[in-house]
C-alpha cells in the first residue's frame, strides 16, 4: 500500500482543519488523520456530493445529527428504530429540494439504506461516496458484532469509497486493499498527550488510593472500563455509587437498572453527567464530548477479570482521549499484567493463521474426495471445530476482518504480559508522553482470582486462603488490612481459625471442619474449661436431624470429657446424649443408634 503524506500545523492553539489540507477525501484510500477531532466526517458532510457515512454505533450518529453546525446539512441518521420508509421519505424530499444525500448509518442498519436507495432508483455503487469512519472498529469489533462487516463486500464494488480514522489498522489481510493508497496526515507540531501509566498487581487497591487525588478538584472524572460488571463492582467497593453515572449499551442499561442503579444511559448527554462518569467501549470512538471544563480521565484494566478490559495503546487509548474536544486535565491508565500470557510477535500469529489454513484445506480436500457418506460425515465434523473455521463466512469465503481481529487481539494481550511491554507499546504508538510507575502489593489480583475460583473444592479454597494469610504475615499497611478483610469476606471461618490456631495446626488437622472447630473451642477456653465448653464441643460434634450409632456417640462423648477433664470418662454411655439432645431410638441393620431430633441448649 503506497503512502502519501500531507502535513498539518497548529494555529492559534488548534490544529488545522482537515479540509484545509485535503478539500475532499479521495477515493480508494485509507486516511490516517493521526489527530482526532480535525473534521474528517465534517469534511465529508460538507462535500458537494452524495455521501453515505458508516459510523460504529448509534451515540455517534445521534451526537453528530444534533450538532448546530450541521443543522443545514440535510443530515439523516439511520440506526435501530429508523425504518426503510423513513429513509425513502428523506430521499424523496432530498431530491425534491435539490440537496445532497447525507446519510449516517450504523453497519447493522446499512442494508436498510441500500434498500431505500434502490427503491428511489439510486445505486450507491455509482451515485454516492461511501465512507467508513473509525474504520479500525470493523476489525476490532467483528468477533462479537457479526453484522459489522456486512457492508464490506458492497464497499469494494463502489467506485467512490474510503476509510478513515485517527488510528486505522493498515496492515490488513484482505487482498482487495492492495490497490488502495494510504494517506498519512503528519502533524508538524508536537501532538503527544501526557499519560500516567500505573501498572500494579492490585488494581482495586491502587484505584482506591488514587481516587482522593482524582476527585480532589472540581473537575468531573471520566472512567473508561469495558465491563459493566466491573463498573458495578468498582462503584460499590470504592463507595462511588452516589457520585456516579454510567453510559453503556442498552442491554447494560437494563442490567444496571435491574440491580437498582438508575443513572445508567445508552446515549451521552452532558445534562446527565455526574461527578464520576463511567463509560464502556461504546463510547471510545467518534463521539464528541464538548465540555466547558477539562476533565480528569482514567482508564482501568483488569486482565484477570476479562480480556476485553484491555485497552490497545495504538487505537483504544488514542480514541478515548479524542472524545474530549476541549482537552483534558489528566490522563491515567491503571492496569495489572499477567506474566502467564505468552510473548509472540505479529508475524507469529500470521504464520499460525497460514498453518491453520493449510490444515483446513487438506482436510477439506479429504472431505470432498471421501469414499462414502460415513467418511464424509466424519471429515465434516472435524472441519467444524478446526481453528481456521472461525475465519470463514457461511458461503465458505474468508472473512479477512475476523482473521485480522484474531491477530490484533493476540497482540493486545502480549502488551499486557508485563509492565514494560505495556509501557513500550504506549511509546511505540507515538501519541503519548508516558510517565510510568509500578505499584506492587504483598497480595494482588492474581491471588484474589485464586480465592474466587469456583471450580475448586472448599478444602482447596481454604488451603489457598491460609497460604495467602501466611504470605501477608502481620498486616502493617492499609492494603494488607484490606486484603485480610477481603479474605474474611470470602471465608470468615478459616481466617478466624488461622488467627487462633495458625497454619501448622490447621494442616495437622488436615483442614477437617469438625476438628478445626473443636480445636478452636478448646483454644478459646484453655485453662478455664466449663460446662459451656463441653456444650460447644458436643454441638460441634453432633447435629440435629442426623442418625448416629451408639458406639460413635459413646466414643465421641468420652473423648470430649477426657479432653476437658470435667467428668470421669468411665461414667459416659451412649445414653449421655439425652442430656444434650431430644432423641429417639433408631436402629439400622445390625447397628443400634439414636436419631437426634433437636438440641436442648442453644449457645
Locate each region found by the language model.
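Conserved Walker A/P-loop ATP-binding site and its immediately adjacent core
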Residues: 36, 40-83, 108, 170-172, ...
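A short beta-strand element within the Helicase C-terminal
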Residues: 289-302
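Inter-Walker segment of RecA-like/P-loop motor cores
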Residues: 71-115, 259-268
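Interdomain hinge/linker at the junction between the two RecA-like core domains of SF2 helicases
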Residues: 166-213
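Conserved strand-helix element at the start of the C-terminal RecA-like helicase core
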Residues: 50-64, 104-106, 210-239
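SF2 helicase catalytic motif II
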Residues: 107-110, 118-156, 160, 297
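Conserved SF2 helicase motif VI
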Residues: 304-329
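The feature captures the C-terminal accessory region of ATP-dependent helicases
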Residues: 44-47, 350-603
Amino acid at each position: 500500500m503506497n503512502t502519501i503524506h500531507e502535513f498539518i500545523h497548529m494555529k492559534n492553539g488548534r490544529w488545522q482543519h482537515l479540509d484545509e489540507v485535503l478539500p475532499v477525501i479521495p477515493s480508494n484510500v485509507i486516511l490516517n488523520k493521526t489527530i482526532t477531532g480535525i473534521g474528517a466526517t465534517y469534511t465529508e458532510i460538507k462535500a458537494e456530493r452524495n455521501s453515505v457515512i458508516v459510523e460504529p454505533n448509534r451515540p455517534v450518529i445521534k451526537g453528530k445529527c444534533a450538532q448546530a453546525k450541521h443543522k443545514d446539512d440535510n443530515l439523516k441518521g439511520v440506526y435501530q428504530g429508523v425504518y426503510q420508509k423513513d429513509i425513502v421519505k428523506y430521499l424523496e424530499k432530498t431530491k425534491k429540494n435539490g440537496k445532497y444525500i447525507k446519510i449516517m448509518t450504523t453497519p447493522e442498519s446499512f442494508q436498510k439504506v441500500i434498500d431505500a436507495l434502490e427503491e428511489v432508483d439510486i445505486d450507491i455503487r455509482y451515485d454516492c461516496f461511501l465512507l467508513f469512519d473509525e474504520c479500525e472498529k470493523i476489525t476490532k469489533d467483528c468477533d462479537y458484532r457479526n453484522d459489522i462487516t456486512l457492508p464490506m463486500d458492497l464497499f469494494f464494488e463502489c467506485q467512490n469509497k474510503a476509510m478513515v480514522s485517527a488510528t486505522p489498522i493498515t496492515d490488513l489481510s484482505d487482498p482487495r486493499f492492495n490497490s488502495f493508497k494510504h494517506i498519512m496526515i503528519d502533524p508538524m507540531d508536537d501532538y503527544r498527550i501526557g499519560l500516567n501509566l500505573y501498572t500494579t498487581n492490585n488494581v482495586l487497591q491502587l484505584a482506591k488510593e488514587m481516587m482522593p487525588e482524582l476527585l480532589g478538584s472540581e473537575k468531573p472524572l471520566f472512567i473508561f472500563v469495558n465491563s459493566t460488571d466491573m463498573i458495578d463492582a468498582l462503584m460499590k467497593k470504592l463507595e462511588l455509587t452516589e457520585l456516579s453515572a454510567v453510559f453503556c449499551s442498552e442491554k447494560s442499561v437494563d442490567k444496571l437498572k435491574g440491580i437498582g442503579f438508575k443513572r445508567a444511559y445508552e446515549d451521552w448527554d452532558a445534562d446527565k453527567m455526574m461527578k464520576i462518569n463511567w463509560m464502556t467501549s461504546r463510547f471510545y470512538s467518534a463521539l464528541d464530548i464538548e465540555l466547558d471544563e477539562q476533565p480528569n480521565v482514567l482508564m482501568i484494566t483488569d486482565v484477570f477479570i476479562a480480556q476485553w478490559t484491555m485497552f490497545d495503546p495504538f487505537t483504544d487509548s488514542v480514541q478515548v482521549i479524542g472524545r474530549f474536544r476541549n482537552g483534558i486535565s489528566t490522563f491515567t491508565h491503571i492496569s495489572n499484567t499477567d506474566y502467564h500470557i505468552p510473548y509472540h510477535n505479529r508475524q507469529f500469529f500470521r504464520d499460525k493463521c497460514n498453518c491453520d489454513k493449510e490444515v483446513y484445506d487438506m482436510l477439506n480436500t479429504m472431505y470432498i474426495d471421501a469414499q462414502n457418506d460415513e467418511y464424509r460425515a466424519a471429515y465434516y465434523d472435524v472441519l467444524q471445530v478446526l481453528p481456521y473455521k472461525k475465519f470463514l463466512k457461511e458461503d465458505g469465503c474468508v472473512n479477512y476482518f475476523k482473521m485480522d481481529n484474531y491477530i490484533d487481539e493476540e497482540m493486545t494481550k502480549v502488551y499486557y504480559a508485563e509492565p514494560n511491554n505495556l509501557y513500550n507499546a504506549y511509546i511505540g504508538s507515538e501519541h503519548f508522553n508516558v510517565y510510568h510507575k509500578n505499584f506492587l502489593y504483598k497480595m494482588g489480583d492474581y491471588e484474589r482470582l485464586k480465592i474466587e475460583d469456583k471450580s475448586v473444592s472448599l478444602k482447596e479454597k481454604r488451603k489457598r486462603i491460609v497460604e495467602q494469610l501466611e504470605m501477608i504475615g502481620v498486616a502493617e499497611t492499609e492494603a494488607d488490612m484490606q486484603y485480610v478483610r477481603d479474605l474474611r469476606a470470602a471465608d470468615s471461618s478459616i481466617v478466624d481459625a488461622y488467627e487462633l490456631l495458625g497454619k501448622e495446626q490447621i494442616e495437622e488437622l488436615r483442614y477437617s471442619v469438625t476438628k478445626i472447630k473443636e480445636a478452636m473451642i478448646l483454644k478459646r477456653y484453655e485453662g478455664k474449661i466449663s460446662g459451656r465448653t463441653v456444650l460447644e464441643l458436643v454441638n460441634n460434634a453432633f447435629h440435629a436431624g442426623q442418625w448416629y450409632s451408639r458406639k460413635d456417640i459413646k466414643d465421641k462423648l468420652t473423648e470430649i470429657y477426657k479432653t476437658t477433664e470435667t467428668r470421669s470418662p468411665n461414667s459416659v454411655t451412649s445414653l449421655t446424649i439425652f442430656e444434650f439432645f431430644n432423641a429417639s431410638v433408631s436402629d439400622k441393620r445390625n447397628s443400634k443408634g439414636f436419631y437426634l431430633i433437636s438440641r436442648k441448649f442453644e449457645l
